[in-house]
Amino acid sequence: MSQHTQDNQINNNETIEIQETDTVPVETNSLQSGLTSLIPMILIFAVFYFLLLRPQEKRRKEREKLVSGVKKGEEVLINSGIYGIVTKVSENDNNIEIEIAKDVRIKAIKSAIVDITSRKREVAATQENNKKNKKVSCAKSS
């Protein structure tokens, strides 16, 4: 019996007290971790959109406006590096005719137009006139 009492004493000395604590459900943690791993992906997509896609869309719209507004008599540059004057614009089949030298005409599609150089010259001339007018008005007021 002495051995039995020694075992009881050992068991009494080795008892562990467990205290109850408030626990957070596991489902909430997994939902939060899922959302936090999704946030970087959303940020990457937003950066991609604003740095690449949006500017490209703007350029495409500007180009469409440029190409659709080409008129007879304008000087253009096409993507093959040829300058010429538009002699004919076909609205239905999207073609233009360009005179590159006297009595030398070629056909091209409108999307081949890289730039309308006559418009740039007009803008540059207008800006030059504005600068001259400002200088003259400043000189008169002095």
From Swiss-Prot:
One of its GO terms (cellular component) is plasma membrane. Disulfide bonds: none annotated. It is found in: Cell inner membrane. Residues 1-21 are annotated as: Disordered. Keywords: Cell inner membrane, Cell membrane, Membrane, Protein transport, Translocation, Transmembrane, Transmembrane helix, Transport. InterPro entries: Preprotein_translocase_YajC. The keyword Cell membrane applies. One of its GO terms (biological process) is protein transport. Pfam families: YajC. It is a single-pass membrane protein. The chain crosses the membrane at residues 33-53. It comes from the Bacteria. Belongs to the YajC family. The SecYEG-SecDF-YajC-YidC holo-translocon (HTL) protein secretase/insertase is a supercomplex required for protein secretion, insertion of proteins into membranes, and assembly of membrane protein complexes. While the SecYEG complex is essential for assembly of a number of proteins and complexes, the SecDF-YajC-YidC subcomplex facilitates these functions. Part of the SecDF-YidC-YajC translocase complex. The SecDF-YidC-YajC translocase forms a supercomplex with SecYEG, called the holo-translocon (HTL). This is Sec translocon accessory complex subunit YajC. It comes from Rickettsia prowazekii (strain Madrid E).
